[in-house]
Amino acid sequence: MKRIDLLRKQQTRLGEDIAAMLDSFLIGTVAKSPSMSGHNLTTKVEGKTVTLYVRKDIAPMAIEMSIRYKKLWTLIQKLSKVNWEILNLESK
């Protein structure tokens, strides 16, 4: 199998993995401050860092959604590299 065919397969798989993760993610970091009793979400809003309070009952889900975003971002970076390689091979 040619290199470009392998890359196209990888591109398709990564696209499917990304699409599967788009339904529930949360951009930012959910953390528990030692000085506070609850969790906070730190994220960027219009270029500024904002800290939002996370209720105790939704903290586990918010943490999971934040982790999901990090995985999603890694997949997007991998897809970008594959797309770059395909672009270079097609232009030869």
Briefly describe each language-model feature range.
Residues 1-92:
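A positively charged, amphipathic N-terminal helix/segment that binds anionic biomolecules
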